[in-house]
Amino acid sequence: MAKLTCGLIQMGLKGDTSMAPDRIRDLMIEAHIPYIEQAAAKGVQVLCFQEVFTQPYFCPGQDRKWYAAAERIPDGHTTRLMQEYVGQAKARVQLA
């Protein structure tokens, strides 16, 4: 039977909901990078993140500023960054 090594990253919001969504996204990605690298070093093949891992869960109000958190797939900022890191690690990432 083949062995599959999986990992899960879950963390609290970095920053504050008064910040712009792109700033929150950048802080959250920055906070995840060491864990991605650690998972790769441990041979993780499938790495899962929590839902909406780059923003507050769910947007904390009806403020239109949260519309800016939406990203295009597959050419959005987060997708491109994750492809770069995951490609180096030869792993797979589940983005929800």
Question: What are the functions of these language-model segments?
Answer:
Residues M1-A96:
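Hydrophobic structural segments
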